[in-house]
Amino acid sequence: SNDDFKVSISIKESDYEHSDSITYENWQAANKILGILFLHFEDTFKYRPIEINYDNLRVSFDKGCYRGQEIVARMKYLGVDRRKFCTIVAQQEYTVSNDIKITGEIVNLDNIKVFNAIIKTAELDHIRNDPKIITII
């Protein structure tokens, strides 16, 4: 604790039973929500690092060189990105619109679908207001 915050822990009995494993679909969905994109061989050379959020998740601007560094650095310091890489969680009935470019596979869970996508920033509010979209991360 400090002057602003205090943390306490309470331990109590629970009937919750946990498992040491999760389903493959839950593992895929968790990775998508974290912004981790697994590319397949056919996706090689399909995306630039900035298109799949590597400029925010996987790149250090303080060290090293990497492919596409100049483009990513230019966008970070000078540009305006007109597209956004995001994770969309939607109801199972949601039909993907033409404004959305799906990256990777759609993960279908019980009553929702989770997928990564690239969308135009100008379309973000329009897509977010769709009643079948649960959240955009």
Residue ranges, per PLM feature:
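Glycine-rich, small/acidic residue-mixed loop/short-helix segments
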Residues: Y24, A30, L34-F38, E42-D43, ...
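A translation/RNA-centric and nucleic-acid-associated enzymatic feature enriched
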Residues: R48
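Structural motif
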Residues: Q69-E70
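Acidic, low-complexity central loop/insert segments
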Residues: S1-L37
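Short, conserved secondary-structure segments in the cores of folded domains
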Residues: F61-D62
